[in-house]
């Protein structure tokens, strides 16, 4: 029972009383996942893919020069 008593006393002192606020603190230091960075990483990935697609479209529209024509 001592484990339960310590949880109850820490909850009572946390000022999270009431039916709506009776949730554990999910914003702890352990909850720092990679989800905030995910949007930025996906945005950077999308930009790189767009640039690659634009370069491929440019290359397809222009005929390639043979190396011997420069001379």
Swiss-Prot record:
Q: In which tissues is it expressed?
A: Testis.
Its keywords, alphabetically, are: Phosphoprotein, Protein kinase inhibitor
Instruction: Tell me which residues bear Phosphoserine.
Output: 35
Q: Which residues carry this modification: Blocked amino end (Thr)?
A: 2
Q: Look up the record and give one Gene Ontology term from the biological process aspect.
A: positive regulation of telomere maintenance
Transmembrane portions of the chain: none
Question: Is Phosphoprotein included in the keywords of this UniProt record?
Answer: yes
Role summary: Extremely potent competitive inhibitor of cAMP-dependent protein kinase activity, this protein interacts with the catalytic subunit of the enzyme after the cAMP-induced dissociation of its regulatory chains.
The entry's protein name is cAMP-dependent protein kinase inhibitor beta
Task: Tell me the classification of the organism that encodes this protein.
Answer: Eukaryota, Metazoa, Chordata, Craniata, Vertebrata
Gene for this chain: Pkib
């Amino acid at each position: 029972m001592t484990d339960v008593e310590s949880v109850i006393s820490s909850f009572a002192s946390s000022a999270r009383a009431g039916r709506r606020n009776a949730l554990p603190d999910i914003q702890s230091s352990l909850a720092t996942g990679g989800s905030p960075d995910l949007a930025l990483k996906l945005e950077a990935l999308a930009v790189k893919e767009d640039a690659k697609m634009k370069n491929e479209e440019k290359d397809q529209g222009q005929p390639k020069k043979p190396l011997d024509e420069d001379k």
